[in-house]
Swiss-Prot record:
It is an enzyme of class 2 (transferase). Its main location: membrane. Keywords: Cell cycle, Cell division, Cell inner membrane, Cell membrane, Cell shape, Cell wall biogenesis/degradation, Glycosyltransferase, Membrane, Peptidoglycan synthesis, Transferase. Belongs to the glycosyltransferase 28 family. MurG subfamily. GO terms for biological process: carbohydrate metabolic process; cell division; cell wall organization; lipid glycosylation; peptidoglycan biosynthetic process; regulation of cell shape. This is UDP-N-acetylglucosamine--N-acetylmuramyl-(pentapeptide) pyrophosphoryl-undecaprenol N-acetylglucosamine transferase. It comes from Helicobacter pylori (strain Shi470). GO terms for molecular function: UDP-N-acetyl-D-glucosamine:N-acetylmuramoyl-L-alanyl-D-glutamyl-meso-2,6-diaminopimelyl-D-alanyl-D-alanine-diphosphoundecaprenol 4-beta-N-acetylglucosaminlytransferase activity; undecaprenyldiphospho-muramoylpentapeptide beta-N-acetylglucosaminyltransferase activity. CDD domains: GT28_MurG. UDP-N-acetyl-alpha-D-glucosamine binds at T10, G11, G12, N124, S183, Q283. PANTHER family: GLYCOSYLTRANSFERASE, UDP-N-ACETYLGLUCOSAMINE--N-ACETYLMURAMYL-(PENTAPEPTIDE) PYROPHOSPHORYL-UNDECAPRENOL N-ACETYLGLUCOSAMINE TRANSFERASE 1.
Length: 353
């Protein structure tokens, strides 16, 4: 028995691949990885001991491109699919799991060509174009969101790494705010952090700001101009995000699915700013259920004024009829919403099929 994991591009997809790879390793099952040279795949897995072999193809996404660029991208995908077909055959792969993203294309189609059972994890509340096409052909589609076309869909807990649960805690007071721009940075959140930093630091609230590598020097300059560089923990990215989340009492974040569920597992109340240009507005739908259950605050990017942060802080500090702060209630309920061992459930479901 040997698995192939494929997909990625961004940290959200790749964190799922990592969680599944860790579970496969725990169960003594060998796995290989197939991704792309474009995006973050190599950064995450080029030297990862979780995989016996790692392959990266020259592929790019097809969505939101001009006609001629789409043709070029499709050609690269097809070329890589035939390479992947030989790789899967060479390694005698018995199961393929796609975590989505354009880099999942070649190995997913190669699995179908080789008649290898294909399993998909759909991370978002709205399916991406590749998964919409592949879902009917897959053995099973795992997701933490309920889809209308039930078919071969399996509702499971999100495959969050156990460290997010291990570092969870119940929040009782807002002393530390985390501005989380995501793996690619987020200009709107970076600006929101800068605008709020003077008032927050004046109130004695600590700030950790993960701004993305492209914005790091610029953010450093602006904080220095404000005289706040020594009062703000500023990072381009952070290798130990679980520890960063653990220290925070409130987070401001994009609404990529992995971030949403990792914050949930950590019990960290969050203001979500969905990326307005995400395909099919999927980031908004990723947190819609949370918003309906009063487990988060959602602010559209075009309404992101500095006062919004302090409005949310006031609401979180309010108490219910039992004398409990909304902050504490939300933190507790978030930890109850997601079950541990989502990755284990997915792997065991596949093995029992």
């Amino acid at each position: 028995m040997k698995f192939a994991l494929t997909g990625g591009g961004t940290g959200g997809h790749l964190s799922i691949a990592k969680a599944l790879a860790i579970e496969l390793e725990k169960q003594g099952i060998e796995a290989i990885y197939l991704g792309s040279t474009y995006g973050q795949d190599k950064e995450w897995f080029e030297n990862s001991p979780l995989f016996s072999e790692r392959y990266f193809f020259n592929t790019q996404g097809v969505v939101n491109k001009s006609f001629f660029k789409k043709i070029g991208s499709l050609f690269l995908q097809a070329k890589a699919a035939f390479k992947a077909k030989e790789i899967l055959k060479k390694h005698q792969i018995t199961h393929t799991i796609s975590v989505g993203g354009f880099s999942a294309g070649p190995a997913s189609f190669a699995s179908l060509l080789n008649k290898i059972p294909l399993y998909i994890h759909e991370q978002n509340a709205i399916k991406g174009s590749l998964n919409r096409y592949l879902s009917p052909k897959a053995k099973a589609v795992f997701s933490s969101y309920a889809f209308k076309d039930k078919g071969n869909h399996v509702l499971t807990s999100y495959p969050v790494q156990n460290a997010f649960f291990d570092f969870a805690r119940t929040r009782t007071e807002i002393k530390h705010i985390l501005f989380l721009g995501g793996s690619q940075g987020a200009k709107a959140i970076n600006e929101f952090a800068l605008l709020n930093a003077p008032k927050l630091t004046k109130q004695g609230i600590k700030i950790t700001h993960i701004c993305g590598s492209d914005a790091h020097e610029r953010m450093r300059f602006f904080y220095q101009e404000l005289g706040l560089l020594d009062k703000v923990e500023l990072f381009a990215f952070h290798n130990n995000i679980t520890e960063v989340m653990h220290r925070a009492d409130l987070c401001v974040s994009r609404a990529g699915a992995s971030s949403v569920w990792e914050l949930c597992a950590n019990g960290l109340p969050t203001i979500f700013i969905p990326y307005p240009f995400a395909s099919n507005n999927h980031q908004y739908y990723n947190v819609l259920e949370f918003e309906k259950e009063n487990l988060c605050y959602v602010v559209p990017q075009n309404e992101l004024l500095p006062k919004k942060l302090f409005e949310v802080i006031r609401k979180l500090n309010q108490k219910d009829d039992q004398g409990n702060k909304n902050l504490t209630t939300i933190s507790n309920q978030l930890q109850q919403k997601i079950a541990k061992d989502g990755a284990k459930t997915i792997i065991e479901t596949i093995l029992s099929a």
